[in-house]
Amino acid sequence: MVRKDYNHPCVVLYSTGNEIPEIGCPSGHEMNKKLVDALHQLDSTRYVTNAVSGFLAVAYHMEKHVENQRQEYDKAMNDAQGSEKMNAMASDVEKQMMDAFACSPLLNESILPIEEAVDVAGYNYLNARHTYIHKAHPEWVVVGSETYPTEIAELWNIVENNSHVIGDFTWTGYDYLGEAGIGIFHYDPTRLESGYQGWFPDRLAYCGDINLNGYRRPVSYLREIAYGLRTKPYLFARRVDKAGQRHDKNRWKYHDGVHSWTYPGYEGTETTVYVLTKDPEAELFLNGVSLGRKKVGEVEALTAVFEVPYQPGTLTVRTTSGEDSIVTAGEAVGLHAEASKTVLEKGGRDVCFITADLVDSEGHTNRFAVRRIQAVLEGEAVLAGFGSANPSCEGSYTDTAWDTFDGRVMAAVRSGMQPGKAELKLIMNGTVAAIIPIEVR
């Protein structure tokens, strides 16, 4: 690993591990030190960290003192999903208790040898420790090696106001297959206490800032605003068709909302509208009529919260830094397709991605409608994959027909071995709704 990418500009840190089960026991301390020394010997120009799970670290000590937990602990340590279970436990603990735990003598005892061995102390879901440890060890450097996406406002404030904290890694930037269900909103009344647990047919984690089709979810805009990279506000609404329904919760789940105001059949249903901004106040308008002003931060950091009865039209927010709007779309009658590129290099190794969104007759995106889309590829290219970002569904990404999710599907097209022409056709309701020409050269 080190020799392969030695001195590569994108490599800033090496890690001796992430959520290692034995991190809090003597053998784990010893192995970590050996790995740190080996990495320093192989590459003295880069720093080394270890992403520590607090619950895994103290489990060794808790097991020594609490005999009746031994079998459950051993099972978790031997289970392939041991770290996932410990993360679920951490997610369920009240934040105040979690912060107290992050600064506890028990955790100090468990991970001090790890912290002393590495160049940068990496903490998973231990926000309070980022600043706490600086008092005892002002020379240490800290990174948030894994953190909840919902807590980025707090975390980035820590980064900006503490020079020893060099940054933050969220779990996670891009959605992924596996750990199915940790970020999915389960509305089934029998599953409200599931928290972390996934249920068939859950397939994705669904905790990414960006979904599987490359579409930015609302929490990504919260992050962009927290970073200071976006000044204008961002507006989104809780799915109106889910308004009033309870779902399971954990801190990987932000809000089940979309940048959309299209919910035919739900007129009059009250839903929650969120405005993300660093400005002190936001004013909301529906079809030009003011719905009032709200202070930012009263309910959530960097957020103004409104309760709004759904009516079709235009929902607009205005702050001192700008405005944002969402417009009700009409019936989904077509597709708007875009390709990441349309010229591929021959040899079977080049790929382009085509996204297709449902649109009405005026070109407005319809995120509510569901349509079956078929992908047909002809010519000197291969349909490498096709599907939606639906986190809970059946089907394979090798299938050529998928239902849209939040109004979108995506295709991955790989170049053929020889130069030539190719064409991707997307068919909806039995009619070709979009054609993407591709050149392989």
Regions flagged by a language model, labelled:
Residues 348-354, 420:
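Short, solvent-exposed loop/turn segments enriched in Ser/Thr/Gly
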